[in-house]
Amino acid sequence: MISDKIKLTAKDILEKEFKTGMRGYQQEEVDKFLDMIIKDYEVFHKELEQLQQQNARLKRELEEQKLAAAQAPQQTIPTPAAQPVYSNTNTDILKRLSNLEKAVFGSKLYE
């Protein structure tokens, strides 16, 4: 997990003591910067926990969906042989319609 790779916690940063030298850093500036880092770490930690929980939930849902799909009855898929019957029927209907149009309107078309 990623939490194993993180070396510092917000508490570690808060409790860190720096030695000061003769012309060392300004303590207030260091403290303010460390406070910002602590807040960021806390936000990152909360976000990480939420994402891990969401990831676990989504994995559970995926497994449930897989199980449901495996247990659901398989729908039959129409075979390609069934489709030519429909196209033949449509062709027959179109031919009949054409013949009827010729019979009814045929004489008027040529006038």
UniProtKB/Swiss-Prot annotation:
<keyword id="KW-0131">Cell cycle</keyword>
<dbReference type="GO" id="GO:0008360">
    <property type="term" value="P:regulation of cell shape"/>
</dbReference>
<dbReference type="GO" id="GO:0051301">
    <property type="term" value="P:cell division"/>
</dbReference>
<keyword id="KW-0175">Coiled coil</keyword>
<keyword id="KW-0132">Cell division</keyword>
<comment type="function">
    <text>Divisome component that associates with the complex late in its assembly, after the Z-ring is formed, and is dependent on DivIC and PBP2B for its recruitment to the divisome. Together with EzrA, is a key component of the system that regulates PBP1 localization during cell cycle progression. Its main role could be the removal of PBP1 from the cell pole after pole maturation is completed. Also contributes to the recruitment of PBP1 to the division complex. Not essential for septum formation.</text>
</comment>
<dbReference type="InterPro" id="IPR019933">
    <property type="entry name" value="DivIVA_domain"/>
</dbReference>
<dbReference type="InterPro" id="IPR007793">
    <property type="entry name" value="DivIVA_fam"/>
</dbReference>
<dbReference type="InterPro" id="IPR011229">
    <property type="entry name" value="Cell_cycle_GpsB"/>
</dbReference>
<protein>
    <recommendedName>
        <fullName>Cell cycle protein GpsB</fullName>
    </recommendedName>
</protein>
<feature type="coiled-coil region">
    <location>
        <begin position="34"/>
        <end position="72"/>
    </location>
</feature>
<comment type="subunit">
    <text>Forms polymers through the coiled coil domains. Interacts with PBP1, MreC and EzrA.</text>
</comment>
<keyword id="KW-0133">Cell shape</keyword>
<dbReference type="Pfam" id="PF05103">
    <property type="entry name" value="DivIVA"/>
</dbReference>
<dbReference type="GO" id="GO:0005737">
    <property type="term" value="C:cytoplasm"/>
</dbReference>
<keyword id="KW-0963">Cytoplasm</keyword>
<comment type="similarity">
    <text>Belongs to the GpsB family.</text>
</comment>
